[in-house]
């Protein structure tokens, strides 16, 4: 969510709150016991984590502020929670940080068979209740560039 803001620092907490609640509502619409709040043992802990039943982290939220604009981004794990755990276990071990792999989940773990398109539709619906949503299609050149670079960022799948 990107919004024009005259004084970006003043609305930081409110933006975190509204986006976290919006994501939780979108997931609740799909049948997830979605809540906002830190999960014990979660990776990258934060009070605006969107979780399932207070047990597992599903989404993290961050903000980027520049003069005149605020961007609130959400990383939501929809499928393949085991891949997230496989990547994070060695990272947290190397860093010497505490983390409970059981605290990491995905929407699919809560609603078996859920499809990405269903999650996208629910989030877009909830966004449209509070914001003017303007879908933007990426150009074929941008999509090609992303696809060709993706291999550098993918974790190996065993």
Q: Could you say what each language-model-derived stretch is?
A:
Residues 30-32, 64, 68-158:
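Long, positively charged amphipathic alpha-helical accessory segments at protein N-termini or as interdomain linkers
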Residues 36-58, 142-147:
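Beta-rich nucleic-acid/ligand-interaction surfaces
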Residues 3-6, 55, 80-83:
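Short loop segments at secondary-structure junctions
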Residues 1-2, 50-52, 76:
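Short beta-strand element of the conserved SAM-dependent methyltransferase core
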